[in-house]
């Protein structure tokens, strides 16, 4: 994309987030990346008081179509200050979409949907996705972030999850079928 569209910024999460909001208000569709969720907390004022509420403040006349991607979860050298996943905080904010894919295929489809949405999205990306292998088509495709996916059909029990918990649910359901003959449905939010 070139230096006009992809660039590094100083390590000031609040300034970076405010700049992304301004770019969105100017007609762009910024993809803002906070590499560590824990530092994204410094930008809560911009996200909570401005980005999520802008449509309401403008009586629906103006939107902030920004996607804020942040990486969460376990990984190399993570202490307690770098291991938080506070997605539920953001799920309670009116005007803000929260996305937490459970597979590489979902990550691509939900990311493209987030970028082209006319509302702000926080995109939580689990580090566990980085080591997953799955076929992902090269051509663009979009997944509806408001729809749940049935990852596995079952008759006896439903397990509902999102993000990395879906992988855990699939593993547990496989063991339950082998050991106890319990058929599990897995629903991915």
Task: Locate the predicted segments by residue.
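Short helix-loop-beta junction
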Residues: 1-3, 89-92, 168-187
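Thiamine diphosphate
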Residues: 1-129, 134
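Glycine-/acidic-rich phosphate or pyrophosphate-binding loops and their flanking alpha/beta elements
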Residues: 109-120, 129-179
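Short, conserved beta-strand edge motifs with alternating hydrophobic and charged residues
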Residues: 124, 160-161, 185-189
């Amino acid at each position: 994309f070139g230096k006009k569209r992809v660039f590094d910024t100083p390590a000031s999460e609040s300034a970076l987030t405010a700049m992304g909001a301004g770019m969105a208000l100017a007609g762009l569709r910024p993809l803002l990346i906070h590499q560590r969720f824990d530092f994204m907390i410094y930008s809560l004022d911009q996200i909570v008081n401005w980005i999520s509420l802008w449509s309401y403040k403008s009586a629906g006349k103006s939107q902030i179509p920004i996607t804020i991607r942040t990486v969460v979860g376990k990984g190399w050298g993570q202490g307690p200050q770098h291991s938080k996943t506070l997605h539920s905080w953001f799920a309670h904010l009116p005007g803000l979409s929260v996305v937490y894919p459970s597979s590489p295929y979902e990550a691509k489809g939900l990311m493209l949907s987030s970028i082209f949405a006319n509302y702000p999205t926080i995109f939580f990306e689990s580090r566990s996705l980085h080591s997953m292998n799955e076929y992902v088509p090269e051509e663009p495709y979009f997944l509806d972030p408001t729809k749940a996916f049935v990852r596995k059909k079952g008759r006896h029990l439903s397990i509902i999850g999102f993000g990395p918990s879906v992988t855990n649910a699939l593993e547990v359901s496989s063991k339950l079928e082998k050991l106890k003959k319990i058929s599990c449905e897995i629903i991915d939010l």
